[in-house]
């Protein structure tokens, strides 16, 4: 049944008029019957919502058919989604701005609200403060009403204040709001006196008979503007800032200086932006607030812009009255300004788009009065066709420019699209507490949404960040510090990206790796950003909101989804429901580096205990400024004990090789099989399935690539069952580190040295050893073995502990040697309680056989053992033994040599050995101890 409804939805997206109405009704009826038969409450609610959306669309389609004869403008979709209490509260809180209240729009004001009888003394006064810049204050002559400014009102009376000539030629003088005036210049074609004029629904009072704004008898004007998540009511009076000179402080029509409605629109907008000393914006943002049209910023200096497609879609929409176009320049020198005739970091209006032979042309207007005009230097235009004659071309400061020249000299192309291009709209409002710096590079705390479409019809998603007083404070502070260039960048950046996740529509941990990015939007310094895409029918996808350097602790946002077929949208859920985030730091003591260093075991470690079989996901991130290469390893370690020696078979899963800033490890199936970023290892401890880890306790090791790389981190762990995670104390916590008096070295023909070890009481200890190469790098590496031995008499000697054959290097080797199938294959579980850390465990006697020789440059370590002074006396002493084979003479001291100890174990620095213990240990001098 639902499949039939989806087919009607598909046809609905492709049809218009009565045909579209027929499919909307048919789909709604099917969903209604399906909802009645649904046994699952969740399915019933989903089907009822789809039915309600289609009924609302049908009502709009019927209303559109009735009004088609009287309206020249297509209907605008409205969000039919029911807001939560939290969302309604958010919108009310966002009404407060700059000491004013801008309530959500409720209804069109009655005409008598503007009567003289409704105001004291017949004149309404808005006491809201409007700030001015120092330059404006120098010539400010007070706030005056139109009849006070224009003492010589023409005979036709006050109507001249609202009556425009055939073409309006707007310009700014001492105003600082170039983007606002450019926006008004571009919007004039939609504000003109005609049926369907945008002004009829944006400015009050409005005279529907003559299709233009009306003069308010009491000086009150009400504007309907879109900002902070909804249409809002903006109230002003008719007083304008006047000047003591010939300069003007508000936008003026050069062809009719009496025309004031553009100046009133400007005043209303500057009221919501903080005053006439407006620090700056962009015209796409301004037009979105003034008209509600969808803003898109196209970056012209990128390599991936499709010129033909971009020109075609913009020109078509512009000619149909569905697009407003403006331009913005970037940074260049004063000399380039004079040469090109373009103002740097300035917004321009586009008044026309035209094809002229092989040239694609923009008619561009500089909103500044008496300012620079494009000189054409370096122009690629080849046509000499006369393009004069239109009213727009006769305006001041206008010039034609080819698309290629626009690409070369402008940074941004702003297009505001009519929402009437779409039939459906959903608005979602939310507050986001900005995560700490250590989590800025990952998405663990980012808002994410699941989007499901049953058709391939295009979807547009607009993210709007609500304005706050604190942002204006930041901009003004930067301006006082003379940081005039790109002031918006001090407010941070944001972006939208779309991902294919597993399971579909669930949250993702970070932008790279096992989650395939379908669309990644740029980070923009604007409060609006747009993502356009064509969905995969029937497959939920994940939308992620990201930010960089947003300076305030929290923000409110609105997501608006536009489409021509219904969408199912909800906050994305976690694929694993149990989560915990812990924070910590790599310090000088705990930044042990990668597995090639013996200090790897000093890295931060955590004991993770799972209560039942579960997949596992881990996300590690650092502060952006640190940009450290980081890694995660999950290891079997005999009940979550601290890892003291790493062997490959203990690896459960790990992240990809060291990645800067953040990384991710997971046993969940990947949605991006072409880009594997975490390793899942098979081992000999048993397993339950390809994605489940057996119940038990594991050790997590967090490392940077090099020892000594310090910085803060955040680790988020997720599982399908309850779990606990606790830090494992470092070996250095409450322990003594006793180095041997000197490195162990070997003379020619020697292969074994030893040093006596003494303890006064029962002591738990382990041995760490590392060779340091200071000799020739071409010498053959020697192999080393280190042990703690009881006694010296053959037959009675016992090896208490010996370094393992793998040492610190085996984990790295095991990761690099895993095949792709092994990385994607089954994950091991946990076996029985056998002891790790010393090879060749002898069951029952508590002693170990000697480990295999290994490259000590990777670091070697024994397991922990108990040193009992009584036992040591019985055996005749305890010895720290270092043995070497190979090396081609490395580390030897020959007769007569000035070198008193070469290196051993692969270099001239010898083997550096120390004992880590919970009690006092003494180590004697080295002596030769070759066995017979």
From Swiss-Prot:
| Family annotation (InterPro entries) | Calpain_cysteine_protease, Calpain_domain_III, Calpain_III, Calpain_III_sf, PalB/RIM13_Calpain-like, Papain-like_cys_pep_sf, Peptidase_C2_calpain_cat
Q: Is Heme found in the keyword set?
A: no
What one GO molecular function would you report for this record?
calcium-dependent cysteine-type endopeptidase activity
* UniProt xrefs under CDD domains: CysPc
Q: Which domain of life is it from?
A: Eukaryota
The UniProt record lists the Calpain catalytic domain at 96-419
Supply the EC number(s): 3.4.22.-
- A Pfam family annotated for this UniProt entry: Peptidase_C2
SUPFAM superfamilies per record:
Calpain large subunit, middle domain (domain III), Cysteine proteinases
Q: Which GO terms describe its biological process?
A: proteolysis
What general EC class does the enzyme of this chain belong to?
A: hydrolase
The entry's active site is 178, 346, 366
Q: Where is the composition biased (Gly residues)?
A: 902-911
Region (Disordered) spans which residues?
890-932
Keyword DNA repair in the entry? The reply is no
Q: Which UniProt keywords apply?
A: Hydrolase, Protease, Thiol protease
Report the family membership: Belongs to the peptidase C2 family. PalB/RIM13 subfamily.
Function field? Required for the proteolytic cleavage of the transcription factor pacc-1 in response to alkaline ambient pH.
What is the protein name given in its UniProt record? Calpain-like protease palB/cpr-8
Per the UniProt entry, what species is this protein from, by scientific name?
Neurospora crassa (strain ATCC 24698 / 74-OR23-1A / CBS 708.71 / DSM 1257 / FGSC 987)
Q: Which gene encodes it?
A: cpr-8
